């Protein structure tokens, strides 16, 4: 089969935003205007096409990013051929940042939605940081311009101030709040209005209202200046007073957007059907095709040092990244992949280069929100779901077995909160194990383990809402009823002092004995190193080199169990520099035990200390309740970092230990008669005060 859409006409984009900026409504409109769904879904009715889990429809928030394929030829059919959009809708709730992170990893561009009233909110900053991390070119869409207090230029100023990026508006708003009528298109210098009769499908262009002409001229020259900075040639032309053509301006803005130098801004109201077609036009005009961005990097599975790359081209060897695993009630496991190079047909064999395992592709489907269309092949630039993968986890690479590559992996955050779960009945016991296994395969920020002492099953995740929803899914999708314990904080441990410790394990008990002996220098790890930094300085073969990996393993295993109160030890540098061995009695096991024994002594010799997770908390509250909210945060050992006034009320920023924040949602509501809202995300680990250490150590007993 030949390619139906040239790769230059592909746009792989994500719609990302803060919880209530109107992201899902915007995605719904995208589907409507691109002709994929004939009835508009409203989030308020719980009928949105992309929100397909029951929990999402009930809570009105998006939890799993659905990938949808749609086509667009321009709001006024200005393009000769259709462009193919692969759109990913992502959640904005902080407990699901992992979903946003993994979608951004496979996108080529993003539309970042802001609310015209509340502007830059805490989660917007998180999403923006993630987009920076993956270098994703983006367009800003200021939505909800029909809401009370909406102000396009104020949001633009906020983005500049709080996100450190200067947006370049290519539109201005005509009116605002109840009087929001449309946009000024700064490229064509026309006013654009929308008709209710066709649900805002086709723009109506008219001259700019006289009272807005001066403002439009000012912002047009701002846009032209941004374009002129794309090259010396354009800059000279601009400085000499020559007019730049709209084609030159467009090409220059596109070049600078893709390079990440500028962010273009548009506005509208998705709910009132005013402006989404122009957002789609901007995606075509300014966001990159897979061929416009650098080739994806990877490494040779046999030698990590050897770097490789794959270009977005059908003729290159096949490579794809699995960015999401979902369980579907009808077909079982769906593995969502982004194809970076080559072609894959159903029935083909591929290799999972991370695990070195062969997989055969059964069927392939392209998703339209919750409906699916079977396809026979996927090509470079495509996003599709594969059925029949046996052992693939999020972030792994599928590729041609003869030309293997491991694409750059994703980093997943460590969970900060844990709860014990118990099945309500004996029958649920086995079902619960299967259900938790499937959920953990889908979501890498969710972990399951068994407490060796109590035999309880412990689940860990990114926040209370995250775990609530997973337990809820267990009940609905797998029919498992479970009781949940009280949330527990995931503490960490670290050492504060440098020390040298001897680990010696000798056992003689008739026949063959055990002998392992090593000297290890321990120190806090270098800045930015979370795990174990292991160094081998053994010279002269006093410890044979085949036993060195066993020493590393012994240290790692003890780190998992901690040295102070049984919590994982982080940021440790261990240098093995001396030791001895026995010709007959030495083996890997003996050296592993010796290293583990040395590590255990760190509590005393290394100044071991307990760390607690600190959360960045933002509370938005009416001024009347500000005193109560701040007093309460102080009582929770919070540190107030600052305050600012916004349209939605006072915003209080603080850092608070997670252990003090359980049940905060209920407390802050009752304190403010339901009018305050808050968001929090993990910030860092800090030394825990002595009373916490005492309590935790006692509990661990």
Swiss-Prot record:
InterPro entries on file: EFG_II (IPR041095), EFG_III (IPR009022), EFG_III/V (IPR035647), EFG_IV (IPR047872), EFG_V (IPR035649), EFG_V-like (IPR000640), EFTu-like_2 (IPR004161), G_TR_CS (IPR031157)
PROSITE patterns in UniProt: G_TR_1 (PS00301), G_TR_2 (PS51722)
Residue intervals of the tr-type G domain: 8-291
GO molecular function: GTP binding; GTPase activity; guanosine tetraphosphate binding; translation elongation factor activity
Lineage: Bacteria, Pseudomonadati, Pseudomonadota, Gammaproteobacteria, Pseudomonadales
Protein family membership: Belongs to the TRAFAC class translation factor GTPase superfamily. Classic translation factor GTPase family. EF-G/EF-2 subfamily.
Keywords: Cytoplasm, Elongation factor, GTP-binding, Nucleotide-binding, Protein biosynthesis
PANTHER family in UniProt: RIBOSOME-RELEASING FACTOR 2, MITOCHONDRIAL, TRANSLATION ELONGATION FACTOR G-RELATED
Gene Ontology biological process terms in this record: ribosome disassembly
CDD domains cross-referenced by the UniProt entry: EF-G, EFG_III, EFG_mtEFG1_IV, EFG_mtEFG_C, EFG_mtEFG_II
Subcellular location: Cytoplasm
Any Pfam family the entry gives: GTP_EFTU_D2
Purpose of the protein: Catalyzes the GTP-dependent ribosomal translocation step during translation elongation. During this step, the ribosome changes from the pre-translocational (PRE) to the post-translocational (POST) state as the newly formed A-site-bound peptidyl-tRNA and P-site-bound deacylated tRNA move to the P and E sites, respectively. Catalyzes the coordinated movement of the two tRNA molecules, the mRNA and conformational changes in the ribosome.
Protein's UniProt name: Elongation factor G
UniProt gene name: fusA
GO CC list: cytoplasm
Binding of GTP, residues: 17-24, 89-93, 143-146
SMART domains attached to this UniProt entry: EFG_C (SM00838), EFG_IV (SM00889)
């Amino acid at each position: 089969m030949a390619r139906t859409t040239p790769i230059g006409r592909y746009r792989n984009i994500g719609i990302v935003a803060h919880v209530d900026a109107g992201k899902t409504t915007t995605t719904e409109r995208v589907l409507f205007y691109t002709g994929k769904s004939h009835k508009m879904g409203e989030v308020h009715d719980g009928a949105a096409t992309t929100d397909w889990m029951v929990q999402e429809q009930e809570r009105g928030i998006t939890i799993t990013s659905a990938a949808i394929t749609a086509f667009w030829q321009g709001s006024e059919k200005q393009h000769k051929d259709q462009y193919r959009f692969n759109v990913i809708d992502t959640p904005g709730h902080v407990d699901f940042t992992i979903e946003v992170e993994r979608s951004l990893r496979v996108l080529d561009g993003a539309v970042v939605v802001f609310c015209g009233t509340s502007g830059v909110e805490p989660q917007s900053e998180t999403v923006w940081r993630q987009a920076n991390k993956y270098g994703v070119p983006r367009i800003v869409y200021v939505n909800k311009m029909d809401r009370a207090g909406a102000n396009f230029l104020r949001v633009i100023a906020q983005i500049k101030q709080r996100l450190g990026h200067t947006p370049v508006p290519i539109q201005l708003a005509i009116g605002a709040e109840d009087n929001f009528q449309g946009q000024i298109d700064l490229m064509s210098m026309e006013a654009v209005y929308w008709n209710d009769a066709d649900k805002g499908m086709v723009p109506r262009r008219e001259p700019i209202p006289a009272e807005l002409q001066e403002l439009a001229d000012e912002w047009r020259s701002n846009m032209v200046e941004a374009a002129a900075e794309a090259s010396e040639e354009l800059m000279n032309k601009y400085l000499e007073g020559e007019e730049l053509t709209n084609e030159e301006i467009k090409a220059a803005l596109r070049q600078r957007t893709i390079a990440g130098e500028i962010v273009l801004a548009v506005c509208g109201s998705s709910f009132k059907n005013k402006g989404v077609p122009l957002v789609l036009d901007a995606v075509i005009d300014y966001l990159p095709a897979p061929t416009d961005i650098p080739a994806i990097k990877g490494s040779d599975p046999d030698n990590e040092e050897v770097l490789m790359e794959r270009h977005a081209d059908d003729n290159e060897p096949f490579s794809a990244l699995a960015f999401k695993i979902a369980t579907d009630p009808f077909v079982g496991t769906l593995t969502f992949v982004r194809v970076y190079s080559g072609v894959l047909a159903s029935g083909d064999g591929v290799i999972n280069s991370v695990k070195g395992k062969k997989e055969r592709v059964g069927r392939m489907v392209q998703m339209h929100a919750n409906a699916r269309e079977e396809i026979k092949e996927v090509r470079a630039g495509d996003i599709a779901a594969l059925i029949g993968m046996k052992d693939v986890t999020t972030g792994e690479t599928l590729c041609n077995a003869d030309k293997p590559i491991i694409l750059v992996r994703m980093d997943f955050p460590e969970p900060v909160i844990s709860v014990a779960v118990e099945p309500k009945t004996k029958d649920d016991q086995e079902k619960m194990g299967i259900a938790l296994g499937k959920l953990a395969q889908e979501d890498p920020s969710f972990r399951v383990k068994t407490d060796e002492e109590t035999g309880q099953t412990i689940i860990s995740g990114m926040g209370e809402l995250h775990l609530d929803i997973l337990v809820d899914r267990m009940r609905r999708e797998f029919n498992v009823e479970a009781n949940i314990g009280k949330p527990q904080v995931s503490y960490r441990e670290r050492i504060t002092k440098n020390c040298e410790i001897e680990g010696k394990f000798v056992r003689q008990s008739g026949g063959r004995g055990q002998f392992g002996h090593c000297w290890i220098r321990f120190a806090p790890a270098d800045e930015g190193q979370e795990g174990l930094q292991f160094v081998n300085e053994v010279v002269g073969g006093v410890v044979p080199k085949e036993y060195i990996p066993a020493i590393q393993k012994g240290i790692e295993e003890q780190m998992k169990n901690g040295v102070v109160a049984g919590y994982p030890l982080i940021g440790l540098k261990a240098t093995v520099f001396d030791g001895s061995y026995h010709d007959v009695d030495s083996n890997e096991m003996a050296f592993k035990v010796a290293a583990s024994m040395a590590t255990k002594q760190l509590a005393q010799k290394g100044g071991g200390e307990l760390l607690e997770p600190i959360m960045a908390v933002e509370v938005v509250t009416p001024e009347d309740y500000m005193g109560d909210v701040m007093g309460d945060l102080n009582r929770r050992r919070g540190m107030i970092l600052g305050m600012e006034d916004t349209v939605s009320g006072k915003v209080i920023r603080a850092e608070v230990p997670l252990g003090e924040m359980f049940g905060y949602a209920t407390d802050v509501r009752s304190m403010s008669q339901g009018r305050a809202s808050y968001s929090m995300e993990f910030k860092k680990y800090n030394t825990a005060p002595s009373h916490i250490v005492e309590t935790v150590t006692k509990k661990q007993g």
